[in-house]
């Protein structure tokens, strides 16, 4: 188990180094960073001084080592657009994105599992067919269109929910949350549904397929022959084994939720890291773009690492395979 953990950790470090190279290359391919920081009338001498202060005259390997060393300390440089440290901008926007992603994931997990279990246990019921239709809609419609439809229905026509923003938030140290205010909760409903709908349909379909497969296995037949109750068979045995692959998918999808929150945050003008990234792209703000790439990659790598470890703990077969000598 220890060797497996170390091997996964080394692979994670290798991935982050590769991503660091890509992020560093963005500065080279997007033109001279000095041109993004100064006006067109800036004298050449001042430009040269800025280049020297930024270390842009050093050899490229030296610049990369310095950039990666600073990135490890979460020092991503100064934003061209905001003239502020990128780390402070990300720190300011991160609570909004994480709060949205966590609520969307909880929504997707709870409703996805419930709908998937019901669809598997009552295949021919009208409600199960309705769930299947909803899953097709959730997978087929693009995220931005779902968001626009929700805004039109609940904000424009009914006027129940706000169409943009985060509402009133409460500061808890450096963290800000809208979960403690009514306006914050109302502002969170539509973005979380928009972001979590695709994940919900994916989890629902996975749970349904796994549940149907597990219910056909021999040990379920044996459990019925022993006289166990239907409730014990369905929820004590079948569902528990069904949730093993769901852990992997849900963990990986959480990273996707954070990465693809860009669209949802843009539609609802949600003040998170995704909206900050869109603004950076519009203004060619390379430090923010590179930092966002590194942060999202770090989240993906960390989630993958944790899911791999949890998977070996939950699944005894995989644990025995890892422990077996080569």
Which residues does each predicted region cover?
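Hydrophobic alpha-helical segments of integral membrane proteins
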Residues: 9, 50, 60-76, 86, ...
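Residue-level signal for discrete positions within transmembrane alpha-helices
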Residues: 12, 93, 97, 133-140, ...
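Hydrophobic alpha-helical transmembrane segments of membrane transport/permease proteins
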Residues: 15-65, 158-180
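An internal, D/E-rich "acidic patch" concept
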Residues: 57-113
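Alpha-helical membrane-inserting segments
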Residues: 18, 22, 26, 111, ...
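Membrane-water interface segments at transmembrane-helix boundaries in multipass membrane proteins
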Residues: 133-141, 145-200
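Alpha-helical transmembrane segments of integral membrane proteins
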Residues: 2-4, 94-127, 173-326
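N-terminal signal-anchor/signal peptide hydrophobic helix marking the start
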Residues: 6-16
């Amino acid at each position: 188990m220890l060797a497996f953990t170390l091997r996964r950790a080394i692979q994670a470090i290798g991935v982050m180094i590769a991503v660091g190279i890509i992020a560093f290359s963005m500065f080279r391919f997007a033109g001279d960073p000095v041109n993004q920081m100064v006006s067109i009338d800036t004298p050449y001498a001042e430009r040269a001084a800025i280049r020297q202060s930024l270390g842009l005259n050093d050899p490229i390997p030296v610049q990369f080592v310095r950039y990666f060393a600073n990135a490890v300390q979460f020092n991503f440089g100064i934003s061209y657009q905001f003239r502020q440290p990128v780390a402070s901008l990300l720190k300011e926007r991160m609570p909004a994105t994480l709060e949205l992603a966590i609520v969307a994931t909880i929504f997707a997990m709870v409703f996805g599992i419930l709908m998937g279990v019901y669809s598997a246990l009552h295949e021919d019921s009208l409600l199960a067919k309705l769930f299947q239709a909803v899953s097709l809609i959730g997978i087929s419609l693009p995220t931005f269109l779902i968001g626009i439809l929700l805004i039109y229905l609940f904000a424009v026509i009914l006027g129940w929910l706000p169409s943009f923003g985060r509402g009133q938030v409460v500061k808890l140290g450096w963290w800000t949350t809208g979960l403690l205010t009514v306006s914050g909760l109302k502002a969170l409903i539509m973005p979380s549904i928009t972001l979590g709908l695709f994940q919900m349909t994916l989890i629902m379909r996975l749970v349904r397929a796994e549940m149907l497969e597990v219910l056909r296995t021999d040990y379920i037949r044996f459990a019925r022959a022993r006289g166990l109750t239907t409730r014990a068979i369905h929820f004590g045995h079948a569902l528990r084994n069904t949730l093993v692959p769901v852990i992997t998918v849900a963990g990986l999808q959480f990273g996707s939720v954070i990465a693809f929150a860009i669209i949802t945050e843009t539609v609802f003008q949600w003040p998170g890291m995704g909206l900050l990234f869109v603004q950076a792209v519009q203004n060619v703000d390379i430090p923010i773009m590179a930092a966002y790439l590194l942060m999202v990659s770090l989240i993906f790598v960390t989630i993958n690492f944790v899911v791999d470890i949890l998977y070996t703990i939950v699944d005894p077969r995989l644990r025995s395979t890892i422990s077996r000598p080569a």
